[in-house]
């Protein structure tokens, strides 16, 4: 957003998803090329564009994690903030949003299931998620 001087929603509407995904990939390459020790949370579509998941997995000292939530929990979380998310801004009901989420999770599951660590987060606090990830990394 900073570099483009537009919000993600504006980029999607003005330049399209393909432009956004290409820009996102360029920025991802820059971030992963740095020596910084970071935790990077990507959007759900990031690993599904082109060979981005392969690129992430092939980057030295990178561990991929899939924090899995149920369709119902994702629907609850996303419904009230949907206007800030270009792919779901047009969806008017929780039922339609749930259908959209189911479809996208199915389509994206090939990429998500390539993650080295998979963790169901529905009944976990943020602290518990961090603890579980640290346990899995240590093993």
What are these regions (language model features)?
Residues 1-55, 84:
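ATP-dependent small-molecule kinase phosphotransfer cores
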Residues 4, 24, 32, 60, ...:
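Short, flexible helix/strand-to-coil boundary loops that buttress conserved ligand/catalytic motifs
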């Amino acid at each position: 957003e900073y570099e483009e001087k537009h919000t993600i929603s504006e980029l999607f509407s003005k330049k399209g998803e393909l432009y956004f995904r290409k820009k996102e990939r360029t920025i991802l390459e820059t971030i992963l090329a740095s020596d910084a020790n970071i935790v990077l949370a990507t959007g759900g579509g990031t690993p599904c564009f082109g060979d981005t998941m392969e690129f992430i997995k092939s980057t030295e000292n990178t561990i991929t994690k899939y924090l899995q939530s149920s369709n119902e929990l994702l629907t609850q979380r996303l419904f009230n903030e949907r206007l800030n998310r270009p792919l779901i801004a047009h969806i008017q009901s929780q039922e339609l949003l749930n259908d959209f989420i189911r479809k996208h999770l199915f389509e994206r599951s090939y990429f998500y299931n390539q993650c080295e660590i998979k963790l169901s987060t529905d009944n976990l606090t943020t602290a518990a998620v961090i603890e579980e990830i640290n346990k899995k990394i240590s093993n």
